[in-house]
């Protein structure tokens, strides 16, 4: 049996009291699967938190009803309110389902892509794309992937507050970037062999905060 270590780290936008990112996870008693959800509400503060909480909670509740996560994601897309000006959803999300047999299913919508490491090296998955339109106006694209987990595999996912950290600051004209985040994680895994989920997430978040010179311009979450 696989031992699964789940944790997260988070920092609010500078001078804000509430985080607009939400991470939830739950073990489904009926089939012993585990569902993890990270949602990033549009903007920051209370409104972003409410929308992200609604999105993550919906994903958890549908999982408890043993719904397929691909179907769950499509239902969420049809439920989420839309920004009337930008024609985009008010929240993004990543859903990960881990079954007792080690099969891991991932659905991603507009979040930075999940980073997977095996033997301390990045593992790149083939992803299928589901495209749809809601009310004949808003288009969306879901990335779907699945693979079999091996012992000591690492799955790291984060909000764009990580990948875009430092944007506009010296050395980060377009932010930290997903590739550099991946390189940083790979370095950590090589340096610290038995790094816990909490410690790994903490290191990523603290580095992202430092990229902003400790005055974060977005909510930051890593799980």
Give residue ranges: language-model regions.
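A short alpha->loop->secondary-structure connector
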Residues: 116-126, 172
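Acidic loop->beta-strand submotif enriched in PP2C/PPM serine/threonine phosphatases
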Residues: 17-31, 126-167
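DG-centered beta-turn motif at the end of beta-strands
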Residues: 40-41, 111, 154-162, 219
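Regulatory cytosolic signal-relay segments
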Residues: 1-20
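Primarily the active-site beta-strand->alpha-helix module of PP2C/PPM metal-dependent phosphatases
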Residues: 22-79, 156, 167-184
